[in-house]
Amino acid sequence: MALTLDIVTPEKRVLSVQVDEVRAPGVQGGFGVRLNHEPFMTALEPGRLTYVEGGREHHYAVGGGFLQVADNRVIVLADTAEAAGEIDVDRARKAFEDAQNRLLQLTEQDESHSAESARVRRAAARLTVAGR
């Protein structure tokens, strides 16, 4: 028996697969889910979501969202989700640099500071997952 992992973004169902384990970046820290885990729901930070299938790890960059666990099913509702091998590193690096430059020009009191900070975290997550 295995966990069912579903990753869904506003655009599409990214993935639906049977897995042995899921590790995700929660807003209160990283956590793991295995078979027969207690039900819960949490918000996700931008970061690396890893799942283990047949002893092999697979990595996704998620741009925040929510994760729910119930009845051996893990549902990830992510703002964005990209497999490590699908990330355009040059584009991710440019997005990171652009967001960082915009953030440096803002103060914490600026209305767009929070959104720009989130863009930096999403771009950094993409670069990390891509291995760059």
Swiss-Prot record:
Keywords: ATP synthesis, Cell inner membrane, Cell membrane, CF(1), Hydrogen ion transport, Ion transport, Membrane, Transport. Produces ATP from ADP in the presence of a proton gradient across the membrane. It is a peripheral membrane protein. The keyword Cell inner membrane applies. It holds the Pfam family ATP-synt_DE. NCBIfam families: ATP_synt_epsi, PRK13446.1. Belongs to the ATPase epsilon chain family. It comes from Anaeromyxobacter dehalogenans (strain 2CP-1 / ATCC BAA-258). One of its GO terms (cellular component) is plasma membrane. It comes from the Bacteria. This is ATP synthase epsilon chain. It is found in: Cell inner membrane. GO terms for molecular function: ATP binding; proton-transporting ATP synthase activity, rotational mechanism. HAMAP family: ATP_synth_epsil_bac.
